[in-house]
């Protein structure tokens, strides 16, 4: 009986954990961290809810947790500062994500990320452990100044120090069929790479207006939605001319696939201009399609990967074109992506959403012979 009581108390503590957490609004950070707040405000971290992200909204509109259970089961990572996060994570509870709740629409708030004390690694998905000390934030600047608003801790936090504080949400996510729906498969030791070094590079501007500094870590979180130009240095495009054809090489020098979400579709577009006339060659498509019973399916239904031609971590992909290059030809190459595979647009009713239908140019190269 005593062991049973202790077990129940332990469960109560675990599930009540989020109720012990309340987070300062991100707007509070703006007064001192003006540049960082402006970057954050336009990022996906500030706009991850169904009401603010049309693509996520379209997927959520089809989700059984929305239509049958009225519970925002994505809250653990999309609205982690929600005042009813416990209910969002608890089977049988009703906990929708609503527009008029500021703790929902603040998304992945400044205070939430900077209170991640440690990360528990799990097979299904990882879990962020949040410090119970409000207004004590983890950072990396050793010569930080005392803030009148909050305390700052710069030691004793492994994940903040090694730049992989993101893996609580961005490492992997398995569904009920044991399918890894979305995964970075990150190798933390790879050439010293980490999440922050690529997605939060150093940019000009001070961390705060209380002490002038030359640079800070970018808080717009470069990715497939925004600021992808910051990532072009990590992918190289080269061309090899042969006698009767040519090869384009795409060298992905990152520690994860070129695109991670199964909705995405990368495309290599190639045009050859000769004597003022441009010939468009066939697009090369890179995708990862998940599905069930042989057909593409939503992430909660999918049980297998049906197709995977996505460029993988540290892969140099070669694409051959049966086109003979002549002297004076110019070859224009564009590598980019659709945030939603065009084949899924109609099913998700996203025909009128520019963010879903437009082609995002990532990197361009031109070669003249």
Give the role of each language-model region:
Residues 3-14:
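Sec-dependent N-terminal signal peptides
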Residues 190-192, 197, 201-369:
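Short, conserved sequence motifs used for protein processing/export or organelle targeting and
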Residues 16-161, 165-189:
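Sequence context of c-type cytochrome heme-c attachment sites
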């Amino acid at each position: 009986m005593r062991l049973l009581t202790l077990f129940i108390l332990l469960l109560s503590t675990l599930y009540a954990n989020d109720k012990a957490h309340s987070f300062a609004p991100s707007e509070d950070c703006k007064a001192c961290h003006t540049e960082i707040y402006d970057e954050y405000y336009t990022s996906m971290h500030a706009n991850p809810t169904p009401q603010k992200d049309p693509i996520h909204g379209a997927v959520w509109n089809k989700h059984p947790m929305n239509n049958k259970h009225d519970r925002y089961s994505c809250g653990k990572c999309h609205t982690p500062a929600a005042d009813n996060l416990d209910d969002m994570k608890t089977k049988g509870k009703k906990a929708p994500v609503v527009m008029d709740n500021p703790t929902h629409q603040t998304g992945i708030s400044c205070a939430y990320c900077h209170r991640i004390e440690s990360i528990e690694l799990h097979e299904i998905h990882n879990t962020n452990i949040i410090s119970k000390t409000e207004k004590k934030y983890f950072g990396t600047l050793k010569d930080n100044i005392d803030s009148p608003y909050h305390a700052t801790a710069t030691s004793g936090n492994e994940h903040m120090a090694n730049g992989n504080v993101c893996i609580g949400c961005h490492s992997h996510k398995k569904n009920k069929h044991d399918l890894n729906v979305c995964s970075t498969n990150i190798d933390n030791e790879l050439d010293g790479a980490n999440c922050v070094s690529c997605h939060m590079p150093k940019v000009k501007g001070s961390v705060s207006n209380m002490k002038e500094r030359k640079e800070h870590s970018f808080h717009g979180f470069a990715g497939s939605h925004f600021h992808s130009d910051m990532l072009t240095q990590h992918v190289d495009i080269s061309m090899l001319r042969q006698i009767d054809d040519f090869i384009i090489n795409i060298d992905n020098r990152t520690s994860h696939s070129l695109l991670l979400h199964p909705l995405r579709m990368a495309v290599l577009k190639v045009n050859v201009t000769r004597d003022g006339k441009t010939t468009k060659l066939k697009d090369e498509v890179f995708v990862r399609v998940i599905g069930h019973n042989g057909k593409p399916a939503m992430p909660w239904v999918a049980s297998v990967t049906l197709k995977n031609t996505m460029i993988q971590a540290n892969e140099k992909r070669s694409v051959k074109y049966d086109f003979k290059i002549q002297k004076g030809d110019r070859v224009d190459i564009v590598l980019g992506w659709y945030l939603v595979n065009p084949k899924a647009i109609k099913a998700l009713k996203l025909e009128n959403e520019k963010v879903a239908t437009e082609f995002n140019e990532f990197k361009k190269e031109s070669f003249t012979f």
